């Protein structure tokens, strides 16, 4: 399957046959960083802080620790065979065509759902400046812009993600520095609250809402990490994957500590966790609370671009998944055709049309944070399925192809053990989703997707698999 589409370094091959390796190491590193700083951090951290208090810091650290090993497994598998275009390919190769089909389509749906959440978030951020702006205007404008830019070249996507990620990095580093200065100067807000690290343990301790509050923070916190595997969909368009992928994956722990742990510590030191409003972004509210509305507008711009960045990643990855699925014969053939600029234009257009579902969600659930929570729960469950498939593929790889593991230049540490630990953790998170009413509703809806996929496989997949065996 993986050799049906050749991947070339430049413009030598016909556009309709080949993806091009036009993403440089600079692009890959920033795509990896941008993928790790998702909308869930900016939009969802208000609710997670409200649910868990300071213990949310440990929630992010635990999830980040687990996902680092998932990414190490993905990295070793992708580098074991450079013909793999994405994790959908190695799933199909190692687990069977059904796995490639389920993984590819689920990952496509993951990013469509995530894109809907981003559309919802963008609407909320736009209303910070324009309270009377219609929901669909901001959403439609962003979707059209992303489609236009992605239709250009893959390098344009890389450049967009580079600058989107740079904006996020500068903003978070600035927030951390400003917050530390406020704490050092014992800054007092207009409400009389003095900035202090003591807020982390003085107001009920590290676990003010007990274990139930701690566990409740996992759902949106998991969603904050979706996109961390995005570098796995760029493998076919990366100039030097042997160097770029390990470097991007190895930097994950540092990114998590810097962007998640430090920023949350600063937020809860300047604004006591009990004062954080769950319906609003604490990144924006921090500056509003200390009387800096201009800075709040800047941060609002940053979180808006963050949501746009996440949607941009989704548009890119969904179109590449549709391209791969079409090449395998389990998606419409039209998605297998590339434009003159070597981008899957029809897949891009189709995915962007699907993103408009985010506007529909706002009408079904008028509460922005309510719509966001429902969408992100579905997304988190589906992403955990994809991450589990990556781990299962790794276990089969270790059993069936030990020689490839032995000569691998990028071995996963504690490989087999951590695969089982991570999968047990994902089961634990799914169980937690049954405890809250809003997440339980989404959990009950999610199986419908797998039922639909199963029916599709009965009619399409088996026929295609038989053809491949011939």
What are these regions (language model features)?
Residues 89-92, 96, 128, 201, ...:
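TM-loop-TM module centered on a large, flexible mid-protein loop between adjacent transmembrane helices
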Residues 19-20, 43-138, 148, 254-257, ...:
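Extracellular loop-to-transmembrane helix junctions
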Residues 123, 136-195, 226, 249-253, ...:
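Membrane-interface loop-to-helix entry segments
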Residues 4-15, 89-92, 119-139, 171-174, ...:
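Helix-loop-helix connectors at the membrane interface of multi-pass transporters/channels
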Residues 14-19, 56-57, 131-134, 166-301:
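Helix-loop-helix junctions that connect adjacent transmembrane segments
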Residues 163-164, 334-345, 384-438, 467-469:
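C-terminal membrane-solvent junction of multi-pass transporters and transport-like membrane proteins
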């Amino acid at each position: 399957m993986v050799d049906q589409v050749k991947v070339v370094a430049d413009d030598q091959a016909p556009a309709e046959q080949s993806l091009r390796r036009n993403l440089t190491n600079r692009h890959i590193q920033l795509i990896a960083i941008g993928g790790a700083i998702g909308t869930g951090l900016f939009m969802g951290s208000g609710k997670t802080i409200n649910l868990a208090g300071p213990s949310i810091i440990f929630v992010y650290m635990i999830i980040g620790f687990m996902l680092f090993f998932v990414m190490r497994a993905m990295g070793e598998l992708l580098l074991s065979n450079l013909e793999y275009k994405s994790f959908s390919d190695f799933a199909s190769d190692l687990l069977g065509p059904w796995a490639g089909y389920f993984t590819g389509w689920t990952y496509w749906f993951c990013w469509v759902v995530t894109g809907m959440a981003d559309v919802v978030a963008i609407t909320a951020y736009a209303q910070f400046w324009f309270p009377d702006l219609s929901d669909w205007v901001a959403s439609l404008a962003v979707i059209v812009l992303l489609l236009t830019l992605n239709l250009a070249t893959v390098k344009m996507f890389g450049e967009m993600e580079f600058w989107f990620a740079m904006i996020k990095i500068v903003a978070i580093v600035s927030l951390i520095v400003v917050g530390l200065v406020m704490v050092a100067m014992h800054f007092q807000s207009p409400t009389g609250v003095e900035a202090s690290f003591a807020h982390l343990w003085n107001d009920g301790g590290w676990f003010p809402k007990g274990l139930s509050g701690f566990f409740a923070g996992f759902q949106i916190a998991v969603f904050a990490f979706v996109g961390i595997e995005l570098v796995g969909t760029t493998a076919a368009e990366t100039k030097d994957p042997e160097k770029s992928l390990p470097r991007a994956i190895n930097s994950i722990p540092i990114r998590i500590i810097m962007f998640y742990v430090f920023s949350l510590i600063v937020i809860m030191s300047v604004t006591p966790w009990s004062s954080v409003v769950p319906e609003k972004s604490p990144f924006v509210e921090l500056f509003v609370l200390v009387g800096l509305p201009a800075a709040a507008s800047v941060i609002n711009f940053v979180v808006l671009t963050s949501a746009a960045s996440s949607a941009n990643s989704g548009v890119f990855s969904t179109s590449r998944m549709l391209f791969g699925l079409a090449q395998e014969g389990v998606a419409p053939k039209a998605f297998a055709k590339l434009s003159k600029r070597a981008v899957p234009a029809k897949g891009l257009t189709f995915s962007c049309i699907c993103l408009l579902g985010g506007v529909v969600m706002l009408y079904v659930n008028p509460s922005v944070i309510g719509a966001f929570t429902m969408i992100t729960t579905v997304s988190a469950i589906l992403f955990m399925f994809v991450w589990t498939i990556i781990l299962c593929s790794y276990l089969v790889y270790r059993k069936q192809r030990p020689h490839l593991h032995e000569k691998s230049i990028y071995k996963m540490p504690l490989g087999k053990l951590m695969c089982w630990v991570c999968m047990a953790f994902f089961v634990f998170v799914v169980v937690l989703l049954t405890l809250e009413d809003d997440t339980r509703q989404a959990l009950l809806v999610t199986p419908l997707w797998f039922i639909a996929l199963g029916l599709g496989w009965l009619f399409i997949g088996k026929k295609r698999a038989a053809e491949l065996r011939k």
